[in-house]
Design a protein with these regions (language model features):
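Conserved Radical SAM active-site core
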Residues: 7, 24, 36-121
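A short, flexible beta-alpha/helix-coil linker loop
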Residues: 12, 45-47, 188-190
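N-terminal pre-triad scaffold of radical SAM enzymes
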Residues: 2-39, 43
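Conserved beta-strand segments that form the floor/walls of ligand-binding pockets within enzyme
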Residues: 5, 27-29, 41, 78, ...
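Conserved AdoMet/S-adenosylmethionine-binding subsite of the radical SAM
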Residues: 74, 85-239
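Solvent-exposed, flexible loop/coil residues
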Residues: 18, 23-24, 50, 232, ...
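Conserved residues at beta->alpha junctions
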Residues: 31, 81, 160
C-alpha cells in the first residue's frame, strides 16, 4: 500500500463546517498544501512547524488507529488538511472506508482534480477569496465542477472576511448557480485562548454576514454558516 502523510487522527467529534456541519465524525488530517492562505487556521500542515509530527501511514494503518480511537462510535470520517487532494493514495483509504461501511467527507480548494473525488460521499470545494492572498484558477475549477456533474453530493463553500470576499463569493455563486452554496464567517483571531472572548467576536461577525446576505438580491439560494467548532472549543486543536 502507498503511504499517506498524516498529522492528526482524532475523534469522535462533530464537523464544524460546510455541508455536513454538526455531523458526528472522526478526522484524519493530512500534511501538505499547494496554497498558503494568509488566515489559514491549520498552517502547521504546510509551514514546516509540524514536520516532525508527520507520520507516513498506509490506509490500513489509518483505519486501525481510527478504530482504536473511535471503536464502534462512528460511521463517518472527515479527511482534512492542508489539501488532501494532493495525495493520490487517498483512493486506497476510501476503499477501506467503503469496505467497512464508513461514509467520508473531504474539503479542498479546487486546485487539483483526483478521480477519487467521485468516491467521496460529501465533497466540499472551497475556493479561496481575495483576503487569503491566493488566486483562483477558474479554468481548473470549471474542469473539476464539470467532472463532478455525475456526483451525488458536492457543494461550494467560501469563507468570508470582508466585502471583497463577499463580492467574490457572489460572483462564484452566479458562475455555478446549480451547485449548493455555503458562506462561512471567517475567524479573525487564531491565537485567542479565551473561548468566551473569541465567541463574542465570532457571533458579531456572523451577524454582520447574515445582514449582508439578507440585503442582497444575488444571494437568495445560499446558506450562511458559523464555524461551529470555534463556538465550542475556540482555537483548540484535535477537537
Amino acid at each position: 500500500m502507498k503511504k499517506i502523510p498524516v498529522l492528526e487522527i482524532f475523534g469522535p467529534t462533530i464537523q464544524g463546517e460546510g455541508m455536513v456541519i454538526g455531523r458526528k465524525t472522526m478526522f484524519v488530517r493530512t500534511a501538505g498544501c499547494d496554497y498558503s492562505c494568509s488566515w489559514c487556521d491549520s498552517a502547521f500542515t504546510w509551514d514546516g512547524s509540524a514536520k516532525d509530527d508527520i507520520r507516513m501511514m498506509t490506509a490500513l494503518e489509518i483505519w486501525e488507529e481510527l478504530r482504536e480511537l473511535g471503536g464502534s462510535r462512528f460511521n463517518h470520517v472527515t479527511i482534512s488538511g492542508g489539501n488532501p487532494a494532493l495525495i493520490a493514495a487517498i483512493e486506497e483509504l476510501l476503499a477501506v472506508f467503503h469496505e467497512n461501511g464508513i461514509k467520508s467527507a473531504l474539503e479542498t480548494q479546487g486546485s487539483r482534480w483526483q478521480d477519487w473525488f467521485l468516491d467521496i460521499d460529501e465533497l466540499t470545494l472551497s475556493p479561496k477569496p481575495p483576503s487569503s492572498g491566493m488566486k483562483t484558477d477558474f479554468e481548473k475549477l470549471d474542469f473539476i465542477l464539470n467532472n463532478l456533474k455525475a456526483h451525488n453530493s458536492f457543494s461550494l463553500k467560501v469563507v468570508i472576511f470582508n466585502n471583497k470576499d463577499l463580492e467574490y463569493a457572489t460572483n462564484l455563486h452566479e458562475r455555478y448557480p446549480e451547485v449548493p452554496f455555503f458562506l462561512q464567517v471567517g475567524n479573525t483571531d487564531l491565537v485567542e485562548e479565551d473561548g468566551r472572548g473569541l465567541l463574542k467576536q465570532l457571533i458579531t461577525d456572523y451577524e454582520k454576514l447574515i445582514d449582508a446576505v439578507t440585503e442582497s438580491d444575488r444571494l437568495n439560494n445560499v446558506r450562511v454558516l458559523p464555524q461551529l467548532h470555534t463556538y465550542v472549543w475556540g482555537n483548540k486543536r484535535g477537537v
